[in-house]
Every structure is written in structure tokens, then in C-alpha cells.
Amino acid sequence: MFFSGDPSTRKRVDLGGRSTKERDARKLLEQTRMERNRRLLQKQQNSAALKIQKFFRGRRSMAIERSKVRHDFCETYGNNCQNVDRHCFEPGSSFLRQFLFFFKAQNSGDFVILVETCRLLQSFVDSSGDIVSLFSGLDYSSEHNLVDFRVKKLAFTCIEAIHQNRNRLRDQLLVTPEEASISTAILMEAVSLLLDPKLPWVCKIVSYLQKRKVFKLVREMVTTAKESPRGKTMTGNILSLERVLILIVPHIGREPCCCTVVDPRWSFSSMILTIPLIWKLFPNLKVVFANPSLSQHYIHQMASCIQKDTCVLPMETSPEFPGYACLLGNTLDTANVVLSQPECSLDMAIDIALVATFFLETLPPVKSSEGESRQGSSDEDDMLIDDVPGLVLNKALEQQITNAIDSRFLLQLTNVLFRQVSLGMQSYDEDKEALAIGTASSFLYAAFNTLPLERIMTILAYRTELVAVLWNYMKRCHENQKWSSMPKLLAYLPGDAPGWLLPLVVFCPVYKHMLMIVDNEEFYEREKPLSLQDIRLLIIILKQALWQLLWVNPLTQPNTGKSVSNDLSKKNPIELIQNRMGIVVSELLSQLQDWNNRKQFTSSSDFQADSVNEYFISQAIMEGTRANYILMQAPFLIPFTSRVKIFTTQLATARQSHGSQGIFARNRFRIRRDHILEDAYNQMSALSEDDLRSSIRVTFVNELGVEEAGIDGGGIFKDFMEKITRAAFDVQYGLFKETADHMLYPNPGSGMIHEQHLQFFHFLGSLLAKAMFEGILVDIPFATFFLSKLKQKYNYLNDLPSLDPELYRHLIFLKRYKGDISDLELYFVILNNEYGERTEEELLPGGQDMRVTNENVITFIHLVSNHRLNFQIRQQSSHFLRGFQQLIPKEWIDMFNEHELQVLISGSVDSLDIDDLRNNTNYAGGYHAGHYVIDMFWEVMKSFSTENQKKFLKFVTGCSRGPLLGFKYLEPAFCIQRAAGSASNESVDRLPTSATCMNLLKLPPYQSKELLETKLMYAISAEAGFDLS
């Protein structure tokens, strides 16, 4: 960089190992290559410049020539065509030749000439009535090539002129033929004249228009026009633009039409049917499109594009009006007409279902007009799918889609699809049957995920043969051990998808919906809708399918909730279906188990999986495992005793986590025996949720105000829980009522007795939960419908017998009444009678003036049962549940059905198992299993009545009911200890005593069986608190 002082030039040494010659050769080659590329680029630029110059010169020459021709035209025919006569349209005239050559839509003068030309055309046709001779002269056949070229060019020029000036003519685009003075009306009527179906050139014009993307031009005109004030206040008259479409649409290439088939991207389906609510704008076009042959053509065209995975929808759609949703709504709007035709084929129904399925899969979930989601009811949380963020359909478009898939559409579609597999047919085509079943299932599955579910379910359950057809198909496949694979038109299903997957995922929710209205006589006696033998087979099929999905081939990451991301349906539809499948099959099996519990028609073990072992149970306790997922999703697959073990393990873990405080930190209650409910309420209500989970120690105070003897090691608390539950749930106190079979449920009129009745219900919920939390069984027989509320389940008509069998019989009488129900003079009101106070309550707004008729009797029945089962006790049940869930989470309770839940609360109704108690008894103080006193004791115990056995159990354990799983699980184990050293007179005069906290019986060595029985009976019947201890 800087001068070093040495002027000599030193030789540079290249250490790269290459000679200078080699380096120079490489450099030369690189320079040559660059020079060659430079010359090539220069050549391309010169060529491009020449083309641009040539194009420019051509356009300039064309413009000059066009201007010259325009000048000559105006000189000859006038600026406003004032020199034109009818012969100007003939082949020999230069009028059309010159005009079509120089016409430019953006030129205002040219546009005026075009309008005047079309006005003259209409005038000449009106006067002569023969448009063919107007264009061809005397002989059309000899001049048809020229004439055809001119008329198709003229027709397109009229449409193009309006399209190019659509923004300027925004308010004139949607005009009627009667508005003859408006330029757009004149142009469109000229096109209509040229498209008369009787004319010989009509197919050539339509083919030319379609090649020039006429439907795209019309779409853009309509889109512009709809923004104008006129577009928002349309009359019912036919529009000129609509008339043109009506004349073009029937040209679908079938005889006698000879039009070429248009590219689907620019077809009527892609360009016009994707216009939002097009039938409101063009109602007459709807009538034309509803023609079976036209609809079949366009719907088949859409179905073919879907199967080829070809995107033909326009891109310039708004989020509120996506093209696929508009196409779906407009297509389904006319599908009823097609499906109602006697000649409607299976292929046509399949195409309609395929198109509807594809676009329904893409839609975000649609809400019903009442604002409810697809589910229809709060409990029916089948198929919840999260809304797609930022994608909200326009309300009118939503309404169009939901109104289109109505009862008539569903009925007609299923009838056509199942026509070949009707229940009465002896022979059937297996391939057609699989095709029909697969198509119907895929469409309905997509509809369930998108549309308001309650309305669809009601239609399918009560107005179609869907359940019977699907069941016969599944039954036959199961018996033959051959499931047909779903047809190839269901592109999102992999080839190895089980054939039962889609039919079952549709069958289950529909059949479950049917069971909500079926009464006991229909189900058990009439065996409708399925026979009991079929139901037994159905249970086997459902159980096998569910076990296959949840255990054998489970999802990688099962969704434990019932909400499934809509992204999943796009990324992995098969996973979404499998997840959905697990939910609906579980729900149906659970409902069938409820029916079996009401009146057994199959063994309870039929609902249980065969592969549940101790390893499975150990896995089920751990969160995140497959076994734990099965426990939450389908607990009935696991035997009851295994679930009880899991439940008791969960309780023990929870107690251990809250029982680590020292003895001085425990909650202590001082309870007066004659004020047990009042004291328990005041002291227990003051505890926090955490304190409730901790140990509670009780000291009883007798009637004299003296504390009873005994230190509470758990036994006194058990006694307290048994006595407080007996007092609190006593119907005499007024918080609960009894059904006819002495089952308890909240008193609807509790507020008339206790001002703080809701707080008491919260307390009672906590009290019951505390008993279950501590593993104490209490004798409280709840009505089945009320136990459902602990599981947060909604009660339906079939739950009514557990509350009011008499009312249930009356409602079923109404349901089956053959005469005119209005003659019974019933109204939508219900009579409440609480403590002699009679009040009327409307079941619907204005119900006192709404008579019950044959049309609305089912609604009346459901409203009455809902009022009695849910509405009347909703506040009491809600507060009870809040208190209950302070200690017992919902997921623990969901493992059990209502009948099992009653066993969890109260234990088995069977008598005490003395042999089980004997096999799990320890001995101390000199006693052993073969001691003569012990032998006498067990003989006495077996001779006791069930009531005395319960008294004994309460005497030694503090609770009159044994452990759920038997005395093996009694902690600590029951023990009999010798109470005195010898059989002296003093010792045998003593009474047996107990230590309930240790489950210990102190038994003196009585000499005779009679004496032992007398002393033991006295001790267990004294009810002397803990003073005997």
C-alpha cells in the first residue's frame, strides 16, 4: 500500500500449483462464455423490440384504419344511423361489416351507434317478423357462414359493451324489457332476439359466447349491479340480463343442441351459481335451472370436478360470501325439484350428495335461526366443532343453506339413494348398496358437523327409513363378516378405512335421537324401532367397534373433549371421523345401558370389554394413558368393580393429600344430638373447600348438655354422618320429597318452607359429597332422574317414570290418542299444586290460549316432562350440584351410570354377607377362628335378621353398610377381641362393647349361645351413643 523504498520489481510466486497458461485459458473460456451470453441477450432484446414495434405499428395502423372506416361509416349511414334501412343487415351491405370492425366499447360514439343499431334491429323485426331474412336476404343456406359470423359477433359486442361500461351504467344493468328507452335494455333485448331457440344460428352464437367467457362477464356485471340502489330494491319482473341467461343456460351439448362443452372454469356453475343469493335476483332463471336435465348436467359437472380435485371456483369472493358456500346454497335451492322427479336416478342423487358433502365439509359451522349452534340442545353436545376464526358467513346465505336442507330435501335424497336397497326388496346389488350407504353416510356426516343438528336429527329419525336401512346393512355385513369398503367417491377416506366407520358414525346419533321419544312400551313390548334381539347384536357391534378404535388402533393423540378443531377436518379427516366415532358410539352404548338398567333385556356383562385386566386398571388410574382415556370416554367397557377400585384409589389419594396436617389442625364439630341438623349446617357451612377435604372430628352432646364419652378416631364421625344424612334428607324437613316408590328428589316447593332453602341444598350437596369422599355409605335412595343431575345430564320423557309414573302414563295416552286431541281441551299450561296452593304456569309464551292439537301434541308432551324433570327443580339441583362438586369432581362421577351411582352412595341392597365378614376377620386376646365362643358368635350373626345385621355393623364400624367391594376392603380389618380373661360371672355379665374407629368388637367369653345372643342384641339395640364403650 505504501512505498517501501525499493524501486525494483520482484517476481511474484504463485503457490496455487497451477501454471500461468492454465489460468489464462480458464479466464479466456469464462470471457468467451460471458460474451456469448451478452450477444444472446442482445439478440433477444432486439427481437423483443422488433415484436413490440411490429405490434405497435399494427395497432397504430389498425387504429388509423378503424378511424378511417368509422369516418366512412358515418358519412354513409350517419352518426346516429339515420340513413339505415332494413337492407343494411343483409350480407351484401357493408353496414355490419364496417361497424363490427371499428367498434370500441370505450368509445362513447361507438356505444351510441351500437344502441341505435340494436334499436333498429328490434324495430325491423317487429315490422317484418322474420329476423333470418333480415340478416341473410332470400337464401340463408348459401350465406350462413357470413351470417353466423355477424350475428354471433353482434351478440357478443352487445354484452361486451355493457360489461366494459358497467361502472358507468351501474344503475342500468338490472333493467326489465319494458324499460325500452334505457340503452342496456335495448342491447340485452337485441341479444335475446338473436338467441331465440328457433333460429338456425343459436348454437353457434352460444358456443362463441361461451368461448369468450360470457358467464364471467355476466358475473362481473351482476356483482357491480348489486351494489347499486336499484340492485338492492328489485321487483319481481323478469330482467333483460336474466332473459339472456335463460336463453344460454339450456345449451349443454345434448341433442338437439350442438354446442361445444365449455371449460368448467368459465361455466355457468362456476361463474353464475357462485353469485350470492342469485335466485333472489333471477327467480325465473331458477325455474329454468330446476329442469331435471339441466340440473343433472351442471351438478354432474361439479361432481366430476370435485372427484378430479379440480378447482373451478372464482377467487374474487368476499369472506361473507365464499364461492363454495354460494354454490352450495344456490344448487341445493333447486335440488328438491330434481329429487322429486320420478325418473331421478341413483347417479343423480349421488352427484347431489357428493357436491353437498364436499362444500359442507368446507363450511364453518352454521347456527340456526334461534341462535343456537348445530347441537340444538344444551345436553346434545354431539359434534361440536370450533368455528374457524375470521370466517363468518352472511346470515342470509346461512339461512339459504339451512332452509335448503329441509325435511323435504332429506326425505327425497334418502328415498332416492335407498330406493335400490329398500327394506321390502328381496334382491339387491351389493355394489349399489355400498355406494348408496356410503354416499348417504358421508353427506349426513358432513351435515351433522355443519348444520343445526336438532332439526336434522328429528327429520331423519321420524320421517325416513335411515335407521332401519343402515341397521340392516350393518347387521348383514357383521353376520357375513364382510364389510364393503367405502366407494372411491369419498376421496378423503383412505383405502384401508373400515367399512363400518361412516355408516356407524351416522347411525348412532340418529338412533340415539329416536330413543329420546320412544316410550317404555314401544321399546320393550312392541320392540320398536329395533327388536331386542337386534339391539343385543347392535351392542356387540358397537362394543367391538369402540374397543377397536380406543384400544386396538387408537388415535395418536385422542381428543378428550368433545370439541374438535375444524383444522383437523382438512388436515386429517379420518382422524376427525374416528374421534367423532368414539363419542357417538359411547353415547349410544351408554343410553342402551340406561334402558337395560330400567328393565334388563341383556346381561350387563355384554357392555363390558373382555380384555380388561389388572394392568389395564393400573394404567387407567394414570392420566394421559389410553386406558384412562377409555375410562373417561367409555367407562361401561370396564367392569363396575374395577371402576370402584379406581374410584376408591382416587378418593384415597385425595384424602392423603389433604390429611397431612397434624391432629391440632383438624376441624372439630360439637354437635347436640337433639339439634344435629342445625349444628351441622352452621359448622359445616363455615368450612372452606380445602377444610371440607380435611379430617373432621365430632364430639356429641347429649340431651342434658353433657359431652358423650369416646374419642373420635373416625367411628364417631361415621355415626355422625349416618345420623345427619338421615335427618337432613328426611321428607319431614321439607327439602326433599318422595316418589311413589319412596325415592328422594328435591322439593319444588322448598322455598315455601325454608327461606334459605338454596343454601341448605348447597349444604346437602357438600354433605353427600363428604360421605362419599370419606368412603361412608349412607342410606339415601335417590330418584334415578335426580341422580342424572349429579352427572349434569338433561332429563327426557323416558326419565319421567322415576318421578311421576301416573303423569307418564297420561302423556303416553296422549301420544297414542287416535282421535282429535283438540276435543280434550288441553292448553300449553301446567298446574302446580304445592302445599294446597294451586298455580298455573305457561309452558310457552301465550300458552293459556294455545290449544293442544294432533300436530303439536309431541311438543306438549316434551314441554310437560321438561317442566317437571328439569325446570321445576333447576335452582335446587344447581345449588346441590355446586356443593357436591366441591369434593367430588364431575369426571369421577362420569365413570358410573345412575344405578351404579346409587350403589356408590348407599351400597348394595342385598343382605349382609356374613361369610365374607367371617373370612376377613382378625382375632385377638385369645380368640381364634376355631374358638367355641367365635363359633357361637357366627351362628348368632347368621340367625339375625337383615335389620339386626345392619345394627350390628353400625355398632362395630359406625356405619350400617359394609364396604362396596366387600369386607376385604374394610380398613382397619374387623377384629374380635376377648373382653375378659376368664369366663367368670363378672365377665359374662358384661355387655359387648366396640371401638368403631378400629372396627373392633370386645366380646366377653359367654358360656351359651342364648346368652351371647341376648347380650349382643341388647348392645346393638341400646343406641346409647358411645357410652357403652
From Swiss-Prot:
Protein task: Probable E3 ubiquitin-protein ligase which mediates ubiquitination and subsequent proteasomal degradation of target proteins.
Biological source species: Arabidopsis thaliana
Molecular-function GO term, any one: ubiquitin protein ligase activity
HECT domain mapped to chain residues: 688-1029
Pathway entry: Protein modification; protein ubiquitination
Keyword vocabulary terms for this entry: Transferase, Ubl conjugation pathway
Family membership noted in the UniProt record: Belongs to the UPL family.
Annotated region described as Disordered, given as residue ranges: 1-20
Name the record gives this protein: E3 ubiquitin-protein ligase UPL6
Catalytic residues, chain numbering: C997
The enzyme's E.C. designation: 2.3.2.26
Biased composition (Basic and acidic residues): 8-20
Domain of life: Eukaryota
Disulfide bonds listed in the record: none
SUPFAM superfamilies the UniProt entry points to: Hect, E3 ligase catalytic domain (SSF56204)
